[in-house]
Amino acid sequence: MPTAAWPSGEPVTAALATLAVDSRCALGEGILWCERRRVLYWTDILAKELWRHDPASGHTHTWSLPAPLGCLALADDGRLLLGLAKALHAGDVEAQLGRRDLLTTTLADVEADEPMTRINDGRADRHGGFVFGTKSEHADLRPVGRFHQYTAAHGLRELALPRAAIPNSICFDAAGTTMYFCDSVAPRILRCRYDTATATVSDIGVFVELDMPGAEPDGSVIDDEGALWNAQWGAGRVVRYLPDGRVDRIVRTPAAQPSCCVLAGDTLYITSARVGLDAAALADQPLAGGVFAHGTGRALARAEDRVRLP
């Protein structure tokens, strides 16, 4: 792979991801790898669809949903937890592979007191909980979104984090005591101490500042070596940051708007989006909205954590 110069002067490995699924999602997001079934799941938020892809067979299935699906998580009983607009749901998707419309059950309503938000990014924590943020639906993106934890024992508990416009990048270190997150309108990824049992956070600080003008931090995943991979919207790249914040690797994407990433063994999968691209931009990047893949050279994936559901 070619080597690129980083502003620090250190060499950085750079590579180009290739098309894995020509999904052409309006807003692909929230991609997960299920190591038990060896399939990918992700959402097209604007199309109100849940996607499933089996890399071995090449088979892809989509389900229609009644509301935008902002995020999803694997559950301990084989179901998926689904963050649908203003409520958390659970669905047995594998039992509904022959259906077009996905049947779900409601777990918890979210922010009934705030009509101008919807569920956005989220991820299972290391101890059976689920942490997610809500996105501002105001035209000016005023920061009214909040961060929440959901557990079977306690239901919803709000995390004492700053209000956000577009919460993203939620992921956890191996111990589950450090949480990474961001507000995509600001070019930085934050981190804090996180306690699952009490739903408390502390010691909020900056993990990394993005170096590229116009780049927005989007979805992230932590690998088996503790490094954070972050999809950077508008920059056409995923960046791997070492635990100390140094840049280790850059993966370019054939689309300017990569949105989320996940590791499956030695492969990095990346969702992307077509929303906001005019005809000229789409002609220049016809694969926008697809899922891209990049071989990492060694197995870096951690098994995705699972939410304990009632």
Language model features: what each stretch is:
Residues L16-D22, G58-S64, T105-A112, G155-L161, ...:
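A short beta-strand motif characteristic of beta-propeller blades
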Residues S23-R37, P66-L84, D113-G129, L159-T178, ...:
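Beta-rich, blade/repeat-based domains predominating
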Residues C34-E35, L40-L46, L80-K86, F130-L141, ...:
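Conserved beta-strand positions in repeat-built beta-propeller and related beta-rich domains
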Residues E49-W51, A87, G145-H148, R188-L190, ...:
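A short loop-to-beta-strand structural motif that recurs across blades of beta-propeller domains
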Residues D92-R99, C192-A199, T296-L300:
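Short loop/turn segments immediately following beta-strands, especially the blade-tip
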Residues G98-A160:
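Hydrophobic alpha-helical segments and helix pairs
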Residues R188, C192, E209-L242:
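Loop/turn-rich, solvent-exposed surfaces of beta-rich toroidal or solenoidal domains
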Residues A264-P310:
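Blade-level signature of beta-propeller repeat domains, shared across WD40, Kelch, NHL, RCC1
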